[in-house]
């Protein structure tokens, strides 16, 4: 009871920090996950150190303090004896109990009863386990016999493992062959599509020529009729002038003239009807929606017992699993491709390595004029499609709408501050933004590196709040659905939640959770906050620019302060984060991560797994955001621009 009461008062978070590796988030053990001490005093498991040491040259960089431990082998590092003592003490009583005699529990066993399957000491064997009812033998002999049995089973399992590996290799060969066939069919479809486009272009040219001939013929008839109408109009005007002159004559002269003049018929030569050519569109040769072709399935049998040799297997295969066929096939043969499993589609796309997001255009270039950037470091998109960019090199926040540049926000000191600084000949304070976000109330939150503060502006550029209390080095900022701002404190190791009023400034602030060097932060529609931990460095950051230092792993916390989903440094067997420099969450709750050292944009679905959205075209991505219309904006720091990509992923179901 006393032990249970003592266990109930343990701080589980503190115990987790001591007994878990902060990189792989696995508990320390005395073997593979043995705790090792770096020269800086931090503890990392042996398995993670092996991976870090294999990918480095000069030593191991601590993910917490960035100090380098210069070693060439793990034997140069000492064990953390304190952690090992805790592990050994926690399992001491259980381990000792497992070693004792099963009968009395007080003496070490020397005999093994094969009939009962228990280990016994000599007194217990002589008392209760005598032959012929029991078959006993020394523990060492029984153990050797059991080891021989296990050795035989191990040999059979290894043979089975080898067979499974061969089958797996054959399956990979089949997968490569299928991918090649898919691409070939897609290329064939593209050729057929281009041929039909050429046919459509020729058909349009012929159609427009025929339409032009009809238009020319009708124009001649209309022009001839217009000519006759103009002549009749001139004659009518001439007769009007003639009669006006007659009306103005004197009475005697008017009466003396002969009145037997006949009135000419002006409209006699005008045709009553016009013969024109009417035109209408007659659809020929096609009924229903236009389709280039359809994917047709054929049965195909692959012998998994035989070895599969990639291209040789593809060349020797007699029938294809998917073929391209023209639209003149029978309806029974049609099998639309969308019936394929979403999970299989996902795996095939990941294997093909095709970039999922297409580049559309880029916005901005290096400069100081409106719409230009100089080392931009943060990006945010509002619900009204307004884009906010933290332009660090130009000491400003730029706001863009759908039409282009809208306005900029700079730091404007008070009158007395400006007067005193100008009088003393000092430089005026600048706004050095590190991160920017806007809440649902239209307030813009900015973390300022100039004085390590949180500043809140209106859209008009008026500063309504400036908060420095409890903040050592504020960096990342995001806005919760409730309108609160969440700010990360890199040196303080905390995430702070601020409630800001437009008239009163910061009215409430509290600590959301603690973390190891949290830097970049984002949140989803439910209020779950994702933040980076540790310290990852961009390998090309030769000038030690702090804004190019990123995260080492990703953690999450709910609005109630409960820790949630974690993505460790080694997010895959052969993949790891190098320098996380930006994050955002899409409408489905999937996490999108920008790694400035990998120069890639990674996608982590809510149900698990990962994929690479953008592999090429980026020099140093430091910020990402999604627009309401489904476009992915990537802020490229060293290219001084915002690059716009398409983002319309297929909605896969979780397998």
From Swiss-Prot:
Ubiquitinated. Keywords: Coiled coil, Cytoplasm, Metal-binding, Phosphoprotein, Repeat, Transferase, Ubl conjugation, Ubl conjugation pathway, Zinc, Zinc-finger. One of its GO terms (biological process) is response to oxidative stress. Residues 139-198 form a coiled coil. Its main location: cytoplasm. This is E3 ubiquitin-protein ligase TRIM32. It is an enzyme of class 2 (transferase). Pathway: Protein modification; protein ubiquitination. NHL repeats lie at residues 360-403, 417-460, 461-501, 564-607, 608-648. A zinc finger (B box-type) spans 96-139. Disruption phenotype: Deletion mice are more sensitive to inflammatory death upon Salmonella typhimurium infection. They produce much higher levels of inflammatory cytokines including TNF-alpha and IL-6 and show much more serious inflammatory damage of their small intestinal villus. Production of IFN-beta and IFN-gamma are however reduced at 1 and 3 days post infection while an increased macrophage-associated iNOS production is observed. InterPro entries: 6-blade_b-propeller_TolB-like (IPR011042), NHL_repeat (IPR001258), TRIM32_Bbox1_Znf (IPR047051), Znf-RING_euk (IPR027370), Znf_B-box (IPR000315), Znf_RING (IPR001841), Znf_RING/FYVE/PHD (IPR013083), Znf_RING_CS (IPR017907). One of its GO terms (cellular component) is cytoplasm. It self-associates. Interacts with DTNBP1. Interacts with PIAS4/PIASY upon treatment with UVB and TNF-alpha. Interacts with AMBRA1; promoting activation of ULK1 through unanchored 'Lys-63'-linked polyubiquitin chains. Interacts with TICAM1 and TAX1BP1; these interactions target TICAM1 to TAX1BP1-mediated selective autophagic degradation. Induction: By interferon alpha/UVB treatment. Zn(2+) binds at residues 101, 104, 124, 129. GO terms for molecular function: identical protein binding; myosin binding; RNA binding; transcription coactivator activity; translation initiation factor binding; ubiquitin binding; ubiquitin protein ligase activity; ubiquitin-protein transferase activity. Its EC number is 2.3.2.27. Residues 327-347 are annotated as: Disordered. Belongs to the TRIM/RBCC family. A zinc finger (RING-type) spans 21-66. E3 ubiquitin ligase that plays a role in various biological processes including neural stem cell differentiation, innate immunity, inflammatory resonse and autophagy. Plays a role in virus-triggered induction of IFN-beta and TNF-alpha by mediating the ubiquitination of STING1. Mechanistically, targets STING1 for 'Lys-63'-linked ubiquitination which promotes the interaction of STING1 with TBK1. Regulates bacterial clearance and promotes autophagy in Mycobacterium tuberculosis-infected macrophages. PANTHER family: E3 UBIQUITIN-PROTEIN LIGASE TRIM32, TRIPARTITE MOTIF-CONTAINING PROTEIN 2-LIKE PROTEIN.
